[in-house]
Amino acid sequence: ILDIVHERTIKTKKASIETRMAKTVEDRLNMYRMRYDIISDKIEKSIKKIPKINKIKWSPPRRNVKKGEEEVGLVLSDLHIGHSHSLEETGNISEYNTEVFVRRLHGLQKSVSDIYELHSNLYNLPTLHIFCLGDIVDGSNAAGAWSPVYIDTPVYDQLMLGFEHLSQCIEYLLTVFDNIKFYGVRGNHGRIAPSGVEKDYANWDNLIYNMLRVKFSENPRIQFNIPKTWWIMERIKNHNFLLVHGDDVKGSGNAIKNLEKFSTSMFGILKEKPDYTICGHFHESTELTSNFGKMIINGSFVGADVYAIKNLHKFSRPEQKIFGINNSHGVTWRYDLDLEYDK
């Protein structure tokens, strides 16, 4: 009997404790609810006391109202006229030949005029800067290890094709822009002899550039800058542009980081800081912004060729860069022109 009484006493105490615990939990929940209600009431009152802010609505600008002037930069590099590889050789991944080059150049022209039509609604765009960064030709078999089995056009014909089609391209762009400034930097594929046999500027690219200069010599709307150096530093709209082909950008690994190191070294040599360092050569369209400035690597007309796919295990689209240049902000809008897209 005593055990039964003891057990009942324990159960009664447990029940009492559980009741008190439940009440304590409920009291706490009620306390938190009241706190939340008080806070909510205060927030609601505060919101109602906030002064109303006039709504700002966007309204379209009046037609023909422009915001000043910008200039346009078009990067041309790595056309590799004379190079040839087929879809069969790349497993249906890529092809390139003279016909493809011409088609892509015409597509580029159309893209440039389309972009001009778009951005000229906002700014006056009187001047086009053509940054021609080399490897216009694919080169001669004896001048370098260019995989001669993938060159199907003699270098003389490469030269004439480059001159003919770049002339036509410039003539077309002169119908779009008031003025053109052409900058010619040679590439490594254009050298006329193996490295070290002739001076660096003895280069098929330079010959094409100078043929263009002679052709347009009586046209005051186009200017040419074709130095014997392998680089150009040009000040455009209060910003310095350092132009190189890219074969002198040394280092293993990341090309864009190596370009940054090159830009830093050139600053030490030239005692003038480049705001933008632009190169080609690597056949990959990429950019890097650092504390030092902006690095820009242009794409190529070729895209992924047999060497890139087989040896480097890389794929890249055929692209070229175009951008706006503002007096205050430097490079503003920019596009990678997809040359594979039929215009």
Name every feature range the model reports, one short phrase each.
Residues 58-79, 87, 91-214:
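Core catalytic region of metal-dependent phosphoesterases/phosphodiesterases
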Residues 27-37, 91, 144-145, 202-205, ...:
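A broad, low-specificity signal for short, low-complexity segments enriched in glycine/proline
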Residues 6, 80-83, 106, 119, ...:
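Histidine (H) residue identity feature
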Residues 174, 191, 202-229, 237-242, ...:
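Conserved beta-sheet core of the metallophosphoesterase superfamily
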Residues 8-22, 176-194, 238, 242, ...:
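N-terminal short leaders/motifs
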Residues 1-122, 327, 339-343:
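Basic, amphipathic N-terminal segments that precede the first structured/catalytic domain
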